[in-house]
Swiss-Prot record:
SMART domains: CRF. This is Diuretic hormone class 1. Its main location: secreted. It is found in: Secreted. Belongs to the sauvagine/corticotropin-releasing factor/urotensin I family. The keyword DNA damage does not apply. The modification Isoleucine amide is found at residue 46.
């Protein structure tokens, strides 16, 4: 038994963690966009 075949098997937990991190990053980016937009609107309303 070599290390070749076992490397091709992806750990489901790793995949889940990867997806979670991506989702969190996406949400954070969206929140930042919303905050920037809110600040812009606020400054224009003054």
């Amino acid at each position: 038994t070599g290390t070749g075949p076992s490397l091709s098997i992806v750990n489901p937990l790793d995949v889940l963690r990867q997806r979670l991190l991506l989702e969190i990053a996406r949400r954070r980016m969206r929140q930042t966009q919303n905050m920037i937009q809110a600040n812009r609107d606020f400054l224009e309303s003054i």
